[in-house]
Amino acid sequence: MANLVGESNIHLSSPVASIRDTETGVTVTTTTGKNFVAKKCIISLPSTLYQDLNISPPLPAAAREIANSTRLGHYNKAIVCYDTPWWRDLGYNGFLMSYKGPVIVARDTSVDEKRFYALTCFVNGDEGARWGEMYPHERRRVVLEQLAGIYGVGLDAPVYQPIEFFDQIWKHETYSKGALAPITALGDYTKPDSPYGRSVGNLHFVGTEFSKEWKGYMEGALWSGEQGAKEVADALLASKASTLAVN
């Protein structure tokens, strides 16, 4: 994809500061001072973050109201890596569910051919909110203690000897502020005249939250991206046809 777009056209570490939409096109300005001018602009941020963008003119009031009311969840992960799949030696497949937490679901995500063994743990909801406020060493401790308790092993067990421990708190990320996808207020998504996800002027909106398939997942993001690209292409073709007709 990078080769298709052209690596010179991919600008990393260039957060968008403002978007100015006019009848003739869009100007996007980054926090690094770069300006990009185009006929159309596709915004793929979660709608929760629209309020962090300086969009001129502002989005319609109804669209702002919906975007400002969307919320992202506490959806966190802890990946505990080991040099052996010790849970299999105990007769378990690594999948578990817990109503006590902090881990509510975990599964074996090992890659056996590479001798990489891991349990991926999901720490979500209210438990995830509390877990995310802990210090890193505390998050590690409570996850290992829970795994040890579930599998009925002691302090000398391999569960307490991971070779790596990774965690991801999406609420801590500036450009996501949560996961999986923004949730709208009841009824916002189903109203026939809802502006949610609809284009405004030369601005088009894509993201997994707008997908009709696999909403909240990468597949949903791809589906929405394809639809957004088609929407822009159709709009440009219609504009070109209109210009030819006038001429």
Regions flagged by a language model, labelled:
Residues C41-A62, I79:
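Flavin (primarily FAD) binding-site architecture
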Residues T31, D83, N124-D126:
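Residue-level recognition of strand-loop junctions within catalytic nucleotide-signaling folds
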Residues L12, L45-P46, Y82-D83, V206:
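A secondary-structure boundary/capping signal
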Residues M1-T32, F36-K40:
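Helical element adjacent to the flavin cofactor pocket in flavoenzyme catalytic cores
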Residues G25-T27, V37, S44, D52, ...:
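Conserved flavin/dinucleotide-binding core of flavoenzymes
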Residues P15-V16, T48, F210:
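Catalytic metal-binding/acid-base residues of hydrolase active sites
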